[in-house]
């Protein structure tokens, strides 16, 4: 009996010790896994810290060691040179890199306008450029439908949806339907007044009265006076001057404008040919340009016209 009890007790003890050992082994395995995981996390942390430190150190090194030499050469300098490209000496490049681009201001001369490229086509609009004047307010005398009008740069033509883009010495540039077109100064063939012989006009002028009777400035309608006071160049809205040509300008035919009140009030007649302006020869092509340039500062103008062989002076008050 005692042997049986002792045997059972020993078996029970062995089983109990086995369970304890198994439990201890499980705990030890768990602790080992946790230790491995802890080491892995610690290693990743130090690796990330090392990478971040390297990036920061590299950025600081680039910042403090940055030199102006890196900006002296354009990225395009590394490209292979073109066949038609000009070569530059290294000294020239170094000289350019040493310039103080934001230094003391130096006045820049107004660039001279270059001739328009040949690709700009002549306009097909039914308008004629009769004259051009330069000055503080460049203007162009343009004839539309038989009527002359003075336009400044940036203004729109009355009869067409075209804008005066530029005013040059012998032409103007128009912007029409999104395209740039050229309107050249009218040549002899564009004149609307026929002259059979320049000598005949000259002879007629010689046979005219030597000293025409000067007329006092006429009284013009109030509305016209107010318009001329604001802009004397609007006189061409009331009086049209069309060049009479025969191997050059021999005068200007005087015609009424859209509003003929000033034409009638001033005493002009159909067929009058203006040959002088303020006692200056009006047959010189530069006379019209001088007139348009001086108009803003004039208080009155005096036109000398030929009428049936006689000369008549007609004065017009602009203010």
Curated annotation (Swiss-Prot):
Transmembrane segments: 43-65
A Pfam family of this chain: T2SSC
GO CC annotation, single: plasma membrane
Single Gene Ontology BP annotation: protein secretion by the type II secretion system
Keyword Transmembrane helix tagged: yes
Positions on the Cytoplasmic side per record topology: 1-42
Keywords: Cell inner membrane, Cell membrane, Membrane, Protein transport, Transmembrane, Transmembrane helix, Transport
Membrane protein topology class: Single-pass membrane protein
Primary location class: membrane
Compartment(s) where it occurs, according to its Swiss-Prot or TrEMBL record: Cell inner membrane
Residue spans, topological domain Periplasmic: 66-319
Additional comment: Encoded in a type II secretion system (T2SS-beta); this strain encodes 2 T2SS but only this one (beta) is expressed under standard laboratory conditions.
Homology family: Belongs to the GSP C family.
Subunit text: Interacts with outer cell membrane protein GspD2 in the periplasm.
Function: Involved in a type II secretion system (T2SS, formerly general secretion pathway, GSP) for the export of folded proteins across the outer membrane.
Protein name, per record: Type II secretion system protein C 2
Organism annotation: Escherichia coli O78:H11 (strain H10407 / ETEC)
